Amino acid sequence: MKVCSTENMQIAERELIVSGTPARTLMKLASAGIAESLMQFFPDPGLCIAYVGKGNNGGDALTVLNILKQHGWEIGFRTAYPRNEWSELSMRQLAEISPPPQEYQAPPLPHTGKPMILLDGLLGIGAKGMLRREISALCAEMNYIRNRCGAVRTVAIDIPTGVDPDTGMPQQNAVEADFTMCIGAVKQGLLDDDATLFAGRLVCIDLPGLHVQALPATELITSSRLTKFLSARPYTDYKNKRGHIGVIAGSEGMLGAARLCCEAALRAGAGLVTLHVHKDVYPLIAPSMPPEIMVRPVDSYADISIRTFSAFLIGPGIGSVSEEDAEAIRLILETGTPTVLDA
């Protein structure tokens, strides 16, 4: 995922509009991506309540409601402002929903047995300054409902209301989201430690034709980005063709670390995994290991046959080591064999 500043995103959006893409089209494209992602995370239709501000972020939320409605969702909205203060785009998007969605005058109640989503469309990345009283009150309401009702999830559009998109600093009553649908790119503030409890899971919604200048040397690594490194295995492959990982991990009181890292090696696709442990802990750890893991007891790590292995994983849970063991580990590192070393 690209990571960008608020300024660069606003520049990219203006350039796209100037090049001939209407703002309404951008809104529909972004909202379609948000709705699609929502339905992937929540495949069973439920109730979605949009919290709508007077700007175009509210228009995004209303457009998402319209799409969800067409897929069997119940919809409604709460708003901080009278409609005569809404943006023209937001009013047009509301008018397109037929029949009109229910406007909640009081906090919505969760539906038993159905997913309930609170969709944060109160403010976008262009909002500046402290939250106004009416916005802050609805933010607090969303957080209260989410925290009191286990089946309720909050989804923020682009940025949780009350979180600075560039610094990640949250204001009082900032929306605590379970998902943030980042339009075009992830705003840099969402990666700051201060934003962790408010951003939730980040989802990037692509906008065709949007060319945003990303921050230099900054990219958010995702699972889809890593899949190219995991090639499909030929059906004729044998375990000896998929590499042999030598693991040095675990000690008395920290046996779980050995199991976790060995299972990780298997899940990564290693054909063979051999765990080396000292003889005094072998009886404790061997029975707990998955049957695919070979466990070898050693007097010292110097007993390990280095040439046997195509890669090493060293360190999880080994605790303090003797000078002899430390020297053996140094020898392994000096061979240049690919190694994951746990500090």
Named regions from a protein language model:
Residues H111-M116, A174, I306-R307, L333:
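A short, aliphatic-rich alpha-helical micro-motif
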Residues M116-I117, L122-A217:
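Internal gly/pro-rich beta-alpha loop/helix module
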Residues A35-G124, M130-I157:
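Nucleotide and nucleotide-moiety/phosphate-recognizing core
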Residues R83, P107-L109, P160, V186, ...:
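Short, solvent-exposed coil/turn elements at secondary-structure transition points
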Residues M1-T79, S87, M91, F179, ...:
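Small-residue (G/A/S/T)-rich helix-start motifs and N-terminal tracts that mark the onset
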Residues Q102-P108, L138-N143, D166-M169, S231-P234, ...:
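A generic local structural motif
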